[in-house]
Amino acid sequence: MHATRSRFPRGAVLAAVAVFSILSGAAHAADTLSVVTFGGAYETAAKKAWFEPFTAKTGVNFSLESYDGGLAKLNAMEQAKNPTWDLIDLETNDAITACDEGLLQKFDRKLLGNTSDFLPGSISDCAVSAMVWSTVYAYDTTKLTTPPTTINDFFDLKKFPGKRGMRKSPKVAMEWALIADGVAPKDVYKVLGTPAGVDRAFKKLDTIKSSIVWWDAGAQAPQLLADGAVVMTQAYNGRIDDAMHKDNKPFKIVWDAQVYDYEWWGIPAGAKHAADATKFIVAASTPQAYADLSKYIAYAPPRKDAIPLIDKKRLADLPTAPANFKRPLQINATFWADNADAINKRFQVWLTQ
């Protein structure tokens, strides 16, 4: 994964100059950047890997707010012409939609220097990928005598009775339902793009609907498992890994049919401190900065040059580790950007039925 190159490649030198020059404007920096993230263990890791080092170098502090995704508040800010956020943490489909609708300012990728080692699609016109994360499911090893190993087991209430935790969203739930119903991962969006495919996914979800405990915030998933409220739960891999390694919880991740995606940094259109937010994105997008995040949470870097900087033992915990990446599905952000409204409406009706 790591291409051979000279010790001081021209691109790296230019990138270093870009980072130095953009950070050297610290004397004119804003006192505080207002940042919204998905909170929890990821935000804690971001503080250690990115926010605190940036503050130490520039004097810029961070005011942090948590949210559960979506563009409602960003839309409201744009309509009021009063953006209160300087930097926003986005899922891919929201990053695409926000850019298309003018809710994010454009990002000059030249500021990143040589970008040849970035993974495909990890830089857009308006945003830069912060990391690669995955939705998986996990279980408590002390509660299940027979370990589940596939996504089919998540839907098998007879073999594995008990409650299931799931994010209150059709995204991933629909994909998992189809895979558990026999659709190959490579064909999921082809099937889901048809009315019959949507019907099929909801029909499969019907088989476990009465046993689902819904969650909204990512931190709730490991807590549901720890409290014994569910026997297995859909979760973000980093949240479960955090509970396993930092809280010594007896959890285990099932990587089969993991749905992975990029997370993004974007700057709201009209942000009051856009220049300093840009400096932060540049600083947080170096190979070392990406590697530093992986020390604190099991999310993978979107740059190949970060891989050699990560401890080999830690690499095994990441979504992209070969042992974990046998039957993955990359979220089709364009599909969700185009179809989220219609499927969400049906999902909300389905929840009440």
Q: Where are the predicted features?
A:
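Bacterial N-terminal signal peptides that target proteins for export
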Residues: H2-L14
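Sec/Tat signal peptide C-region and signal peptidase I cleavage site
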Residues: L23-A29
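Early extracytoplasmic/lumenal segment of secretory-pathway proteins
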Residues: A30-A98
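Extracytoplasmic ligand-binding site segments that recognize negatively charged/polar headgroups
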Residues: G40-A45, P83-W85, L90-A226
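A ligand-binding cleft/hinge motif common to bilobed small-molecule-binding domains
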Residues: A95-T97, M232-P250
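Periplasmic-binding protein-like
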Residues: D117, W133-T135, V198-T207, H245-A271, ...
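Mature extracytoplasmic/periplasmic domains
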Residues: E263, P268-P328
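Conserved C-terminal helix/tail region of periplasmic/extracytoplasmic solute-binding proteins
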Residues: F325-Q353
